Amino acid sequence: MAKSELKRKKHQSGNEEVKEKRQKPLKNDKKIAEELPQDEDDYEQEEENEDADQNTSVESESEELDNENEDERVQKSVNLNASSTSDIEKFSDLQLSENIQKAIKEMGFETMTEIQKRSIPPLLAGRDVLGAAKTGSGKTLAFLIPTIEMLYALKFKPRNGTGVIIISPTRELALQIFGVAKELLKYHHQTFGIVIGGANRRAEADKLVKGVNLLVATPGRLLDHLQNTKGFVFRNLRSLVIDEADRILEIGFEDEMRQIMKILPSENRQTLLFSATQTTKVEDLARISLKPGPLYVNVDSGKPTSTVEGLEQGYVVVDSDKRFLLLFSFLKRNLKKKVIVFMSSCASVKYMAELLNYIDLPVLDLHGKQKQQRRTNTFFEFCNAEKGILLCTNVAARGLDIPAVDWIVQYDPPDDPRDYIHRVGRTARGTKGTGKSLMFLAPSELGFLRYLKTAKVSLNEFEFPANKVANVQSQLEKLVSKNYYLQQSAKDGYRSYLQAYASYSLKSIFDINKLDLAKVAKSFGFAHPPNVNITIGASGRTDKKERRAGYNKKNHVDVYSKQRSSAISQDKERGWSR
């Protein structure tokens, strides 16, 4: 009995000693920062020198330290940010660490946007936030700055595992968030990583096991790692960010998000949920992810428009058979500008890119059926270009911050006003951004303008004189009829366009029965409508499993694409008529 008591006292004494050592460094953050390893190799070496028991002990101690330091940080942040957000205009007004202030300054940011002014202070104070803001409002910095500051304040190291998880709906948006996080973490020692569908899963798992403090992820791949990657430490999670929540749910990740919420620890976790629209599903997700009584930040309520200032918006009424001619003429006149053209289906984008590149009008294309590496390369190539044309589906419509876009062209109109708002949000971004948008509408589709007006979006009608539109219809039809592979691509594009049109939710406006198929066929280069098989009324969206697999018909498609590319190249060498 006495021996047991002696052992217990000795254990208590040891704990007090550990606690004293643990508390002491809190008085000198700068000294601790200087003692931290300088790169990931140091982290890895440190982990290799610890056995499993020591690592468990360190992680357990780290949890206690985090909780203690977090209470101190939250109280400090509440006191420092108690003043009205109207007093805070610049990032330098925030009580941030020197390292992150330096990174923000080097990135060229000085004045905060409305969403940043209203959300960063309460986030620094530890509040859960449900944010609503139009695209291009600066949400990325609004959630990255507080979460990185938290990691720094809690002295996260690789052995502590993941402290921040940011969930994004698309791979491109995840890559973009990752890029911004990398710049903000330039002067920090915390580790960061990204896990997305289409990337090398084993390489991701290896990095997670080594320790990733800030993780950017898409829902499907994140759930995979949470369930199957042994050694992925996420018990110390302190901040969860759900970006573009409405989009995540729209594209079919509702079940995955519910499973993720069940797996992730909720104790001591701050949650940030950003959504451009507040739907019933978003409210349900907020209910299971946020603590009761979150701070609701809506910077759009009461504003006269749903799109950003500095954006000049217009539409043009054009018959289906003249759509390509107008697009071709418009792009030829804007070769020195940066232009994004939205289309409704992957096959339409693919065909139009092949066609335009063939007739020496260089374009890039981005859609969901491309391999991930190509999508990534295309995205960054267009981001870094001073001028150029990008043809894409809605994969690029949400959240992506592409610099200096001059024109957004909606060649195929969107399914609803929300999609319109997100598409045009690729231009006129930031506090002083400017840009223009143009939407093509058939005479039968003009009723869509009423829906836009209800959503606080007003457009002016643009007119293009007929003598300014190049009439290349006969050359187009001749080219498509002579080139077999281009003809097959045109058929695929035509079929997928009709399938997508049939899936539109606003049937009173976008009624496939009102389409003049002969005119639609001409816009794809056919003199007469080709015979294609479509199911009217079926969804034009790909199945979720097919989408996650990256379009699993890859063997057939890859061979077909190579043959077509080779044939088109041979045609050009022969100097076929254009």
Curated annotation (Swiss-Prot):
Ranges of residues in domain Helicase C-terminal: 310-480
Ranges annotated as biased composition (Basic and acidic residues): 543-561
Motif window: Bipartite nuclear localization signal: 322-338
Region feature Disordered, mapped onto this chain: 1-81, 543-578
InterPro entries linked: DDX18/Has1_DEADc (IPR044773), DEAD/DEAH_box_helicase_dom (IPR011545), Helicase_ATP-bd (IPR014001), Helicase_C-like (IPR001650), P-loop_NTPase (IPR027417), RNA-helicase_DEAD-box_CS (IPR000629), RNA_helicase_DEAD_Q_motif (IPR014014), SPB4-like_CTE (IPR025313)
Sequence ranges of Acidic residues compositional bias: 36-53, 60-71
SUPFAM superfamilies reported for this sequence: P-loop containing nucleoside triphosphate hydrolases (SSF52540)
Pfam families associated with the record: CTE_SPB4, DEAD, Helicase_C
Feature: compositional bias, Basic residues: 1-12
Annotated compartments: Nucleus, Nucleolus
Residue(s) carrying Phosphoserine: S60, S62
UniProt keyword terms in alphabetical order: ATP-binding, Helicase, Hydrolase, Nucleotide-binding, Nucleus, Phosphoprotein, Ribosome biogenesis, RNA-binding, rRNA processing
GO MF: ATP binding; ATP hydrolysis activity; RNA binding; RNA helicase activity
Residue ranges annotated as motif DEAD box: 243-246
UniProt motif Q motif: location: 89-117
GO term, biological process aspect, one: maturation of LSU-rRNA from tricistronic rRNA transcript (SSU-rRNA, 5.8S rRNA, LSU-rRNA)
Segment forming the signal sequence: none
Main location: nucleus
Quaternary structure note: Associates in the nucleolus with the 60S and pre-60S ribosomal subunits.
Family recorded in the similarity comment: Belongs to the DEAD box helicase family. DDX18/HAS1 subfamily.
Domain note: The Q motif is unique to and characteristic of the DEAD box family of RNA helicases and controls ATP binding and hydrolysis.
Protein name: ATP-dependent RNA helicase has1
Organism: Schizosaccharomyces pombe (strain 972 / ATCC 24843)
Phylogenetic classification of the source organism: Eukaryota, Fungi, Dikarya, Ascomycota, Taphrinomycotina
Gene for this chain: has1
